[in-house]
Amino acid sequence: IRLRHAYLNLNWGSSSLLVGQTWNPLYGEVSPQILNLNMGAPFQPFGRAPQVRYRYNAAGIQVTAAALWQSQYLSNGPDGKSNKYIKNSLVPEFYFGVDHKTSNFIVGAGVDVLSLVPRTQATVDGNVYKVSERITTVSGEVHVKYTSPLWHVAAKSVLGSNLTQVSM
């Protein structure tokens, strides 16, 4: 089954809690204006993920924290794309971001941490050995967007590592 968006969002005014599957937070509020689903990959992070996301808004500042898992957009590893690498790690992907918003301007940044265990055993000359391997990557993004009735100007930069789960 391919699930696009299915979530529960509890909104208390200045804060909200989202539980379910929706856009990966790296996708963000600054993305290309498009006519079809060509989202700009491999330059724009694109993917949906099961997640628990908390947002707090105060005085034009929005803080986002999320813990994510992988379902259909997967990390690549020794056995190809699979969700077993994040299952082996027992640690979700984490995201933290801050945005400053006005009626027509957004500027912000975010950090994503992903820790995977690509394999738990290795076979050498017919012998199976237990291995202890972990890869932890930190990725960052900054973005800015200005909109008016006549203009839409946006810029985003991603410095990423091991971001196959968001089509990069």
Protein language model annotation of sequence segments:
Residues 29-37, 70-90, 114-132, 165-168:
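Outer-membrane beta-barrel translocator domains and adjoining extracellular loop/strand segments
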Residues 1-73, 90-91, 95-103, 146-149, ...:
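Outer membrane beta-barrel
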